Amino acid sequence: MCVSKKKLASKKIPTNNSSNNPLKNEIIENILENDFIKDITMEFNGISFPVYSEFERTYQQLFGDYKTKIRCQDYLFLIRHRKLYNGGLHKIQIANYIKNHFITRYDFDKISMTHLMCACIYSINDSNLELVKLLVNNFNFTKRDNTDHTALSYAFKNPGNIKIIGFLLNYIESDYFEIDQNIINDSLIYWSKTDYLPCIEMAKLLIKAEASINYKDRTGSTILINIINNKNYYNITDLVKFLLTEGVDIHESTTICPDNNVVKEKWTTSIGSKLIESVKFEINGEQIFPSYYGDYDESCRKPKYSIMNHLIKRYCWDNNKRIISMFYDYGYRELPNTTNTSILEFTKQIVNDIEFRESYFRKFKPDLIEKQREIVYKPGSVRSEIIKLNWEINSGQTLNPNKYIFDYFGINNLIELEKMINDV
């Protein structure tokens, strides 16, 4: 079949020209900022006055005075605008979609999700990086939805979004606004609860942004507990070692029982629950809304389980003693409360070895200090000769390096030198 050139031309996807970026023009910016009347002027006595001045726009961007721009939409962005977020559009198509649907940075849907949140939750391997850069502003960065999540936390939903996370964290530093530090802390919690093995480099970015490594969520869980209890991660040795080197609290107690399946409490589950909750049902003409999560039980708040309890539970299915031994390397000294004889013997041996080393150094510490001082300060020692030689070199004296070698080895003449060479 012969296809006309006109039809072929209509299917051709235009290339993105960096010098003429369709996402960087003034029309797109005005729509995103909800500045629909920016170019409208009023005339009074022959003088034109702009309705929306450039100064007013700058003021709103800096100080967050954007209440008149906020719009709540009575539908779900994840469903209505999924074509925008799923990574299937190139830049020109994104620009056209924003124009046609009047997408703004101040919109949120019926469960308080913003377009920035949706772009982050759909992104895989930074597929929505350009869209995130386009959508972010002070309002939708700090905005929380009905599940108490932010756009930054949703960037951890799928793997590989390290550039998006880095960009969002840099946005905090580069822009003129303050945020609740718990936005960063909560994101570190979500990092530790993903279905895929968490990326250490992402955690480093959050810690650099002053995320607390010992932060607890509302259930009393920490990033260390989440990682230990997640059976999606088979080998967590490197993750645990990283947290230990960063100073995670290994003596922390928690209300979370090791027998609980923490993996069932995925942080992304709440999104689906809210989506279902937003759907109305009618029974006998009466509207019924499906119930959301059960409230967290506040009656049992006293911590009674140690991190070691969780490690022992994990050992029952992965047989990894190395993580347990690392805890003792970083200062843990208590024996675990378990009936597992293999673990008891293993940890007793570690504790006994540590106590022996510590007792040895306590006993011989004075002698070791004396030997150290002798090596450093005793006249005639190698170190003292090096210090002496360094002093003479820096003082400008004429030196004969061979003389120091001969003196040190007791070589007084040529015969003794030849004898030593022959012996070697």
UniProtKB/Swiss-Prot annotation:
Alphabetized InterPro entries for the sequence: Ankyrin_rpt, Ankyrin_rpt-contain_sf
Domain of life: Viruses
Tagged with keyword Repeat: yes
UniProt keyword terms in alphabetical order: ANK repeat, Repeat
Positions annotated as ANK repeat: 115-144, 147-177, 184-215, 219-252
The protein's name: Putative ankyrin repeat protein R858
Source organism: Acanthamoeba polyphaga mimivirus
